[in-house]
């Protein structure tokens, strides 16, 4: 079983190259494994959309998506694409957990999605908005804090990087930043041991 977020990962903002996607596909096929491809951010690409790995593994994959990142944050509705037999099994599991997701929310979403042009226009608008914010923020960081090393995002919602000086404790630093009404997530929160480090995850979409 392989679980991956190949597009604009949270927190690292990493996106798999085409070569790495092909390598993952080859490994899953070789061992007759199962791939869970989690894609909550894949539609938030700025220039080029990557091919889904699961598209090459129709019988050996689950492809997960969410509308909370692309439409409305409070709309906690997602979807799973898999072969028919796997979906049947998932339905039984879902019913045993909570019967079903909110019917009203699903109905509202279904009505909205009937207009594919409207939804695609919305996606393009937020892609353009996020791209402008990401590039502005990245340029500002490189100009004002050049010792903070990072890659300019190519999609998604996050910018991740770290200070050259590994002695900088970003967990302690955020306490001071909060006094100036500036907030970020110190990267030690994403590690098992929670040991302070010099890395930061920013969200540039607000």
Segments (PLM) and residue ranges:
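PLP-dependent class I/II
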Residues: 1-206
